[in-house]
Amino acid sequence: MKIKRIEVLINNGSVPGIPMILNEIQDAIKTVSWPEGNNSFVINPVRKGNGVKPIKNSCMRHLHQKGWALEHPVRIKAEMRPGPLDAVKMIGGKAFALEWETGNISSSHRAINKMVMGMLERVIIGGVLILPSRDMYNYLTDRVGNFRELEPYFSVWRQFNLKDAYLAIVEIEHDSVDAQVSLIPKGTDGRAIR
């Protein structure tokens, strides 16, 4: 799988270990392949034909091997009970969060806002959201969150004046298309079966 771009929204102060963390994330993304066992990510170009959840599996396995905790709960506010973060690396008692979007665009907003809330509360020191490109989006489950659709809101998150915080969006894309490869299985929740 290839990384099209990394859009840094917040990079204030000193967040320890950022180069190492970003290298681990980029290396993990590059392990993502389809079909499984392939050395690249080849997608069947059926419009809305491919599932999204299986795509992140090898990335998460790689991060886990590097000491990241998977499906990690982070307590942000007493009145909030956000779902767990896909992956967390603890640095100096604080979490660096990673979310790989498998839901709709509303889920993308929630993922970013959860990380920003955690930074405001000082329990999260940084976060990265991984989103498909618009080209890749065309071949995935209907209405999955994607980079282009979230991009108009980047200026909102850039306005947060957070001390010692880092926030970025990584845009990913398939390496190639091939109508002969199998479709990525879809889940049975939300819009996955559409």
Swiss-Prot record:
Pfam families: BamHI. The active site is at 101 (proton acceptor). Mg(2+) 1 binds at residues 86, 100. It comes from Oceanobacter kriegii. This is Type II restriction enzyme OkrAI. Keywords: Endonuclease, Hydrolase, Magnesium, Metal-binding, Nuclease, Restriction system. It catalyses: Endonucleolytic cleavage of DNA to give specific double-stranded fragments with terminal 5'-phosphates. Binds 2 magnesium ions per subunit. Mg(2+) 2 binds at residues 71, 86. It is an enzyme of class 3 (hydrolase). One of its GO terms (biological process) is DNA restriction-modification system. Homodimer. GO terms for molecular function: DNA binding; magnesium ion binding; type II site-specific deoxyribonuclease activity. Its cofactor is Mg(2+). Its EC number is 3.1.21.4.
